Amino acid sequence: MSPTLPDVAVTEPSTLSAPLRWVGMQDIAIPVQLETGSSQLAARASVQVDLPRAELKGIHMSRLYRLLDTHLQQPLSPAMLSQLLQALIDSHADCASRAARLTLSFELMLRTPALRSEGLSGWRAYPVHIAAQCRAGRTTIQLQIEVLYASTCPCSAALSRQLLSDAFVQQHAGRDTLPLRDVVQWLQDHGTYATPHSQRSVAQVRVELPADAQRLAIQQLVGLCEQALATPVQAAVRRPDEQAFARLNGANLMCVEDAARRLRKPLAEHYAAFHVAVRHLESLHAHDAVAETGSDDAVLGPTTM
């Protein structure tokens, strides 16, 4: 038996000579770690390099996998991702590769406290997508998160208030004054005469990290977005928390345009390039309402909803 195994990627030329923009692997199951000593997260990775040499049959995919596996044993950081991309390029010097790209997708689990109940908290999952690319010695890293929130329609709220006030006037026609306790009792009995429609909504936010970024700062981006929206969905709730959530929704009525603009302002203060896509899963309509915005000079494409 021959001790040498055949390697057609090296020994056989391509019968259809052409350079390839990207070649590699997709949907690789691999664990990642966000901080030193933290738990590992199940992730999916894609990794590719370019193949400028038209006559070569293919790249060395095992090299990509081994480098990915080795580097991802370290906590995720902009520096580590940049080192990994350069190592991928260097590993394919015989292919004249000049560019590499990597994507990572996973869910970040965060424990969030209840709005009112002391000591009560629950877990929420945030989909995270990282896209890193190195070309001509320049590395760019994009970070995308998904945040769930509630949206109560301001138009529907106005219509509901009108119906409620009309019902009050009709029932108390001819009376100029009413005891306060009677008004309170009427509101208790009829306050839900009409209610505005609200729904679970989703915001996908993508940012490009500054070139000098030391950390991915995923949790900080989540907090920035949830603070701007003001009505993030809750995990563990009791009645006081549900009441507080109802109050937040009443104080933060928003249509899809409002939500997109709420996110745009703080993102513009922290990132030079960003893109926002929001979607309200309408309870009134059989379709969704959507809006997008982004930085004027953003090189980021539309987010996939």
Curated annotation (Swiss-Prot):
GO terms for biological process: tetrahydrofolate biosynthetic process. The gene is folE2. It catalyses: GTP + H2O = 7,8-dihydroneopterin 3'-triphosphate + formate + H(+). GO terms for molecular function: GTP cyclohydrolase I activity. It comes from Xanthomonas axonopodis pv. citri (strain 306). The keyword Oxidoreductase does not apply. Its EC number is 3.5.4.16. InterPro entries: GTP_cyclohydrolase_FolE2, GTP_cyclohydrolase_FolE2/MptA. Pfam families: GCHY-1. This is GTP cyclohydrolase FolE2.
